[in-house]
Amino acid sequence: METLASLYNEHLSTLQQRTRDVLERHQLDALLIHSGELQRLFLDDRDYPFKVNPQFKAWVPVTEVPNCWLWVDGVNTPKLWFYSPVDYWHSVEPLPDSFWTKNIDVQPLLNADDIAQQLPVQRERVAYIGYAQQRAQALGFSAENINPQPVLDYLHYYRSYKTDYELACMREAQKTAVVGHRAAYEAFQSGMSEFDINLAYLMATGHRDTDVPYDNIVALNEHSAVLHYTILQHQPPAEIRSFLIDAGAEYNGYAADLTRTYAADRDSDFAALISDLNTEQLALIDTIKSGERYTDYHVQMHQRIAKLLRTHNLVTGISEEAMVEQGITCPFLPHGLGHPLGLQVHDTAGFMQDDKGTNLNAPSKYPYLRCTRVLQPRMVLTIEPGLYFIDSLLAPWRIGEFSKHFNWDRIDALKPYGGIRIEDNIVIHDKRVENMTRDLKLA
């Protein structure tokens, strides 16, 4: 923990420097960052599960406590008003005493509404960062100082460059997720249902289903052709052919996002396709380096998908280059190669080209690509190619001019398996790429 404490000190210094810069640029005195508020269900007396403001947990690893406030000016010790009411109806988090609290001025906030009296009176040049805009207005913040876009753009852009503390947290999240993936694979091997496989994952990771950074995707057979399948059938299918799991974990607010696909019959054609996609994914990662645009690797992955379509006799009589040019690979790989990862699963600034918020959109041919950045050291991204058999995407190709090149009998034979996705989390360094997932031997 001493090591994490020293890394956090450096992390805090980096955030303070960024804060000084953004305040000076926009003639502000401070930022007031709100953890968030509970949101009440309509016509009910219960609340939705609390999800913290990512800009708040960038500063402090407080992820489950609403009504907290952080005052930062880039110079003085950050001040945290920590919500700690007297309450016998609900459990209350005690005032934190951890590796990070020596660097933060932590003050208890007994009542959520008391923050108005706690804040400095002069706050005309203070920006509110959070989603409770009505609360900010009640505190006297002007509209232009509630989530000002230029400030958010600056903060989002530099969140792409992870500090050593953030990388350490993300490696810990990887460890937890890998434990869960191994438990889920064992559950799949024993013939469990999607629902029970998910329970095995949660048990192994120590997460509740509201704690994971995104809804776990646990898909058997053709369900894995639904990219964000989250139904979780309670009964296993009569025949189990394949298993796709896309599930992550969190550590101090930082996410892991991993996907693996398995065939029940290791000697099947589908198993061979999984193996070859795995080979192509690793080969692509071996080519990734700082200074190159992420979009280029997405296009290269489509070239590799074309190779697989040819070698597995799924598309014939047309060159790999023509497959990519004509978009034949797109119904098989309809999503992007991956996305930035960090405090959020789909982390901010994937399209942002500078700290002023200049965006470069995804190419029109690949509209679901989530990152167009030039890769730089300290960026963390997912690499998650897929190869799916999705009826709705393949249907137009059955009647088009290129239909004759599709081996429909073979495609239809693989449709009951759903699809494949293989996802690793990588860190860009100066002279190498760190594969956090494979470093933990998750095959």
Swiss-Prot record:
* Reactions catalysed, as given in the entry: Xaa-L-Pro dipeptide + H2O = an L-alpha-amino acid + L-proline
Q: Which GO terms describe its molecular function?
A: aminopeptidase activity; metal ion binding; metalloexopeptidase activity; phosphoric triester hydrolase activity; proline dipeptidase activity
The protein's matches in PROSITE patterns, at most eight in alphabetical order, are given as: PROLINE_PEPTIDASE
Per UniProt, the keywords (alphabetical) are: Dipeptidase, Hydrolase, Manganese, Metal-binding, Metalloprotease, Protease
State the free-text cofactor note.
Answer: Binds 2 manganese ions per subunit.
User: Under which main EC class is this enzyme filed?
Assistant: hydrolase
Q: Does the keyword Metal-binding apply?
A: yes
Instruction: State the Pfam families in the record.
Output: PepQ_N, Peptidase_M24
The family database entries (SUPFAM superfamilies) matched by this protein are listed as: Creatinase/aminopeptidase (SSF55920)
One Gene Ontology term of the biological-process aspect is: proteolysis
Cofactor(s) essential for the protein = Mn(2+)
The UniProt record gives the binding positions of Mn(2+) 1 as: D257, H339, E384, E423
Q: Where does Mn(2+) 2 bind?
A: D246, D257, E423
Q: Which GO terms describe its cellular component?
A: cytosol
Enzyme Commission number(s) from the entry? 3.4.13.9
Function field: Splits dipeptides with a prolyl residue in the C-terminal position.
Family statement drawn from the similarity comment of this UniProt entry? Belongs to the peptidase M24B family. Bacterial-type prolidase subfamily.
Q: What is this protein called?
A: Xaa-Pro dipeptidase
State the organism named in the record: Yersinia pseudotuberculosis serotype O:1b (strain IP 31758)
As recorded in Swiss-Prot or TrEMBL, the protein's gene is named pepQ
